UniProtKB/Swiss-Prot annotation:
Residues 450-511 are annotated as: Tail. One of its GO terms (cellular component) is nuclear lamina. InterPro entries: IF_conserved, IF_rod_dom, Intermed_filament_ifa/ifb. This is 60 kDa neurofilament protein. Residues 96-449 form the IF rod domain. Residues 100-135 are annotated as: Coil 1A. It comes from Doryteuthis pealeii.
Length: 511
């Protein structure tokens, strides 16, 4: 009676390729399942039990299990996940699902094979009972051996169930982690969309700020042109003011000269009136007095003395008038110099203001470079610049108004001076008319023979003076003919002329 030996070997190996190699016949099976990159754990189990045949020989029953599991280190931040990374995660998830399905299928195959082994064990147990009934002790030994191996198989099943539970928990954790990753991915996409919108807004804001900077630069250029134009206008106005001041000075000098001539003519007129009145009185006195040689000599000396006194008084008055005119002219010159000093001060002030404006423009240009880097403060700085520019415009307008007012004032003063000059010319013309009237009157009286004799007697040994007097009268006649129109003056003095003619007739009869 022969005894056959049986050896059953169960080997489980997990590999990445997912290959499954079933056992040949009914003696063993093997499968493999591995999910990369989960390599954090590795289990290797093996068991071996002796097998005693009914013939007393030993047989080895070996079981070997290799399991590997794990998970890769998940990243802590998902802010920079790109579409490629997302696709990679999706591909890994699909691959993991496929691996899990393969693992479940293989695990089902494994359970079926375990059941098959249990059925085979039952069959073997039946055969063992049959053998026990046949061989006795050998069957009991085989029974013990199979019971031991069955116990180990039960332990192996329990361990496999525990590992299955662990794997189920791990799968649940992985699913939860995957859901969290999907949620984080959605949040990352939302943040990415928000960042894109913010970048677009910032680009638009940057473009607007660059446009405002360009507009400010153009405004500054236009303000510089306006400043140059205002400077040119100011220079022209200063030139016009200089010309007007020169014209005013010339007109003032002419006015002073005319005033001087007027006063000189008035005083000369007064002097001539006094001389003629004195002569008339002396002539009247001589007409009623003794005409001896001694009296004539006495009166000649008195007349010469009176003429000298009058000449001295006239010279004194001329000197006084000259001093007053010089003082007045010096005062006016001092006033003009003071005005020129004020004008120079105004020009200096304008230059300082221009320098300040240039420095302000330089500061503005320097600030523009900072404003390009500080877009957040650009609006406030632009408002400050606009306020400064408006203030400068107001200052320029005020200065222009002041210059216009000064020009209007100077024009009014010049018109008043011209009016005064015209009045002086009218007064001078009237004085010349009056002087010509008096000369004509004297000429009419001189044409009489008695008047000539009286003059010759008064003048005596001074024929040159008589010639001078006649020359003056001739000139006065020419001036009268040039001016003309003295009918009223001669008419008003007709009674005086009749009285003078009667006196001359009486003097001629007495001679």
């Amino acid at each position: 009676m022969s005894v056959t030996q049986k050896k059953t070997e169960i080997s489980t190996t997990t590999t990445y390729e997912g290959e499954s190699r079933p056992s040949s016949g009914m003696s063993g099976f093997s499968y493999s399942a591995k999910i990369h990159p989960r390599t954090s754990g590795y289990i290797n189990r093996s068991s071996q039990s002796p097998f005693r045949s009914s013939m007393g020989s030993n047989a080895a029953y070996t079981r070997s299990y290799d399991f590997s599991y794990g998970a890769t280190a998940m990243p802590g931040r998902y802010a920079n996940i790109s579409s490629t990374g997302v696709n990679h995660v999706k591909a890994n998830r699909e691959r993991e699902k496929q691996d899990m399905r393969d693992l479940n299928e293989r695990f089902a195959n494994y359970i079926e094979k375990v059941r098959f082994l249990e059925a085979q064990n039952k069959k073997l147990a039946g055969e063992l009972e049959e053998l026990k009934s046949k061989w006795g002790k050998e069957t009991s030994a085989i029974k013990e051996m199979y019971e031991t191996e069955l116990e180990e198989a039960r332990k192996l099943i329990d361990a496999t169930n525990k590992e299955k539970i662990t794997l189920d928990v791990r799968v649940t954790e992985l699913i939860d982690q995957l859901e969290r990753q999907q949620k984080d991915l959605e949040e990352s996409r939302t943040y990415h969309q928000i960042d894109q919108e913010q970048i677009a807004r910032q680009n638009q804001q940057l473009a607007d700020l660059e446009g405002e900077i360009s507009m400010l630069r153009r405004s500054i250029e236009s303000l510089e042109k306006e400043k140059m134009r205002q400077s040119n206008i100011l220079a022209k106005m200063n030139d016009e003011m200089e010309k007007m001041r020169m014209d005013l000075n010339n007109e003032t000098i002419n006015h002073l000269d005319a005033e001087n001539r007027r006063q000189t003519l008035e005083e000369e007129l007064e002097f001539q009136k006094d001389v003629h009145a004195q002569e008339l009185k002396e002539l009247a006195a001589l007409a009623y007095r003794d005409t001896t040689a001694e009296n004539r000599e006495f009166w000649r000396n008195e007349l010469a003395q009176a003429i000298r006194d009058i000449q001295q008084e006239y010279d004194a008055k001329c000197d006084q008038m000259r001093g007053d005119i010089e003082a007045y002219y010096n005062l006016k010159v001092q006033e003009f110099r003071t005005g020129a000093t004020k004008q120079n001060m105004e020009v200096t002030r304008n230059k300082e203001e221009n320098t300040k404006l240039k420095s302000n423009m330089t500061e503005i240009r320097n600030r523009l470079a900072d404003l390009e880097a500080r877009n957040a403060q650009l609006e406030r700085t632009n408002q400050d610049l606009l306020r400064d520019l408006e203030e400068k415009d107001r200052q320029n307008e005020l200065e222009s108004c002041q210059y216009k007012e000064e020009i209007t004032k100077l024009r009014g003063e010049m018109e008043s001076i011209l009016k005064e000059l015209q009045d002086l010319m009218d007064i001078k013309l009237s004085l010349e008319l009056e002087i010509a009237a008096y000369r004509k009157l004297l000429e009419g009286e001189e044409s009489r023979v008695g008047m000539k004799q009286i003059v010759e007697q008064v003048v005596g040994a001074r024929p040159n003076e008589a010639e001078v007097l006649s020359t003056i009268l001739t000139r006065s006649e020419g001036g009268y003919e040039a001016t003309g129109g003295i009918t009223t003056t001669t008419t008003t003095s007709s009674q005086e002329r009749r009285s003078m003619s009667e006196e001359k007739k009486s003097m001629g009869s007495s001679d």
